């Protein structure tokens, strides 16, 4: 399954490392990533893939909650199909 993840928050060292480490621990593969810093704000969009027989989007979001708290971020994930449907409207 594929999903789109967004990460936003005040820029600081270690954001990409924290997010990618948590995803790797879940065996979630990052297929594509785009990130930018606007003034002091960090923004990143990731296209990720994972085995939906072993893991759900809710499982990933739950794991990312600790990264959000530790890093002071807002992290959201949704299925690629839902993301595409909403953005096609």
UniProtKB/Swiss-Prot annotation:
- Coiled-coil residue spans: none
One Pfam family it belongs to? ACT_6
The secretion signal range is none
| Positions of the ACT domain | 4-78
Q: Record's InterPro entries?
A: ACT-like_dom_sf, ACT_dom, UPF0237/GcvR_regulator, UPF0237_ACT
Tell me the PROSITE patterns matching this sequence.
ACT
The family assignment reads:
Belongs to the UPF0237 family.
Q: What is this protein called?
A: UPF0237 protein CE1668
Q: Which organism is it from?
A: Corynebacterium efficiens (strain DSM 44549 / YS-314 / AJ 12310 / JCM 11189 / NBRC 100395)
């Amino acid at each position: 399954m594929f999903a789109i993840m967004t990460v936003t928050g005040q820029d600081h060292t270690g954001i990409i490392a924290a997010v990618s480490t948590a995803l790797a621990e879940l065996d979630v593969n990052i297929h594509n990533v785009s990130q930018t810093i606007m003034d002091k704000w960090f923004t990143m969009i990731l296209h990720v893939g994972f085995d939906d027989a072993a893991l759900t989007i809710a499982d990933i979001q739950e794991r990312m909650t600790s990264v959000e708290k530790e890093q002071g971020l807002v992290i959201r994930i949704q299925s690629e199909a839902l993301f595409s449907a909403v953005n096609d409207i």
